[in-house]
Amino acid sequence: MVPVIALVGRPNVGKSTMFNRLTKTRDAIVGDLSGLTRDRQYGDASWQGRSFILIDTGGITGDEVGMDEKMAEQSLMAIEEADYVLFLVDARAGMTAADQMIAEHLRKRNKAAILVANKIDNIDPDVARAEFSPMGMGNAIPVAGSQGRGISALMEAVLGHLPRDAEDEALEQDVAEGEEAVRIPGPSEKDGIKIAIIGRPNVGKSTLVNRMLGEERVVVYDEPGTTRDSIYIPFERDGDKYTFIDTAGVRKRGKIHEEVEKFSVVKTLQAIKDANVVIFVMDAREGVVDHDLNLLGFALEAGRAIVIALNKWDGMEPGERAYVKTELERRLFFVDFADIHFISALHGTGVGNLYKSVQAAFQSAVTRWPTSRLTQILEDAVSEHQPPMVNGRRIKLRYAHLGGANPPLIVIHGNQTDSIPKSYSRYLENTYRRVLKLVGTPIRIEYKGGENPYEGKKNTLTDRQVNKKRRLMSHHKKAEKKRRDKR
């Protein structure tokens, strides 16, 4: 399971700056899932190959009223969700009553936490540590978040206390085996294809899970655990193994009450990270809403294969259906590679077809292609549509090979690759998708510039070459002397 780290502290101590630095912005979830998470913002981050989910919270002052009180409540909820807490304080302002209140809350909850003294620019780190030592949170780690100073030491201290995710361990093993190692995930003997069922509350996730498991199978799970535990449900269908990752929990069909279904962002994000394929469930009667786009965006950033299920399609008028299809085409253009199914989880209409799309998306996401095949596709694409000129020189793309899977990563080598425009990258992506007949999975293309293997190396001659050079020089001198003597 991917660990969760929460950033907490008073307002303006640098939590958002730290969040942006660790998520590198492009890895952060687009938006803050407004309406579901209030002021909590969730991001997918990594440090030296270790993945984790980061939560940015609103500030806590201890004297909140009205909306500020609700924001503080959300910050305290983030503490409960997290495996580890980064408690940020302002080294310039010194210790405050609000800092002491937060420290007391962390102690009462027996929460694993580390004290971070931020904004140490032009401040002696030892003085900063001494300032906050009365809080009883241990030695503060000094950082300057805006400049990135001290971040490495902080993250090494934090990640040393967190469990390793299975995917991270596999990637580290690849690195140990060599730079060119490529991990191609496949269905494990035990779990089969792991499918995450995600979506907003009340769209019918639990109804769909029970329907896909089979009418005759009634599953009851009442296991103790934290609020962010997901339910893993292994099963077989037509000889194929699967594992559902159900963020809503699985209940008896007669006891499913969609209106009280809990929604946890953390559970959803962790389920996406742990899955091979995501089935994204939407309510056809509500159409496409911003929350749907946010969740789909995270699944896309995580590189997971995607199947879209538009639930509650039954009973809709033809005009309503036509409008919804138009909206899907307009707003879901960024996942146009995903199969869309119009279903009724309650009545079972169209549900069986989901398995075919899951299988196709998974196979597209994990299939191996030899370097010769990927290079031939590249050469054909370049022949049909040349890359643009840069400073009077044509960009040259030499060969391509597979760099990873789930999602497929195609590494293209050439020169001036830093100057390749996004439009040409989209052209190559679409070409690979069309030729390889890929469905349901995003594709990532990575460029590597051509490097001169002799750059920076001295031209050292062998003994034989040195002797030959001497003979040639001696012969040249004798010939030159003869020419001068004849004159």
Swiss-Prot record:
Organism domain of life: Bacteria
Domain KH-like residue range list: 367-451
Cysteines paired by S-S bonds: none
Residue positions binding GTP 2: 199-206, 246-250, 311-314
GO biological process per UniProt: ribosome biogenesis
Source organism per UniProt: Pseudomonas putida (strain ATCC 700007 / DSM 6899 / JCM 31910 / BCRC 17059 / LMG 24140 / F1)
Domain EngA-type G: 3-166, 193-366
Quaternary state and interactors: Associates with the 50S ribosomal subunit.
Chain intervals with Basic residues compositional bias: 467-487
Any one GO molecular-function label of the UniProt entry: ribosome binding
Bias-annotated ranges (Basic and acidic residues): 448-461
Binding positions for GTP 1 per the UniProt entry: 9-16, 56-60, 118-121
Keywords annotated in UniProt: GTP-binding, Nucleotide-binding, Repeat, Ribosome biogenesis
InterPro entries for this protein: G_ENGA, GTP-bd, GTPase_Der, KH_dom-like, KH_dom-like_a/b, P-loop_NTPase, Small_GTP-bd
Protein name, per record: GTPase Der
Family that this chain belongs to: Belongs to the TRAFAC class TrmE-Era-EngA-EngB-Septin-like GTPase superfamily. EngA (Der) GTPase family.
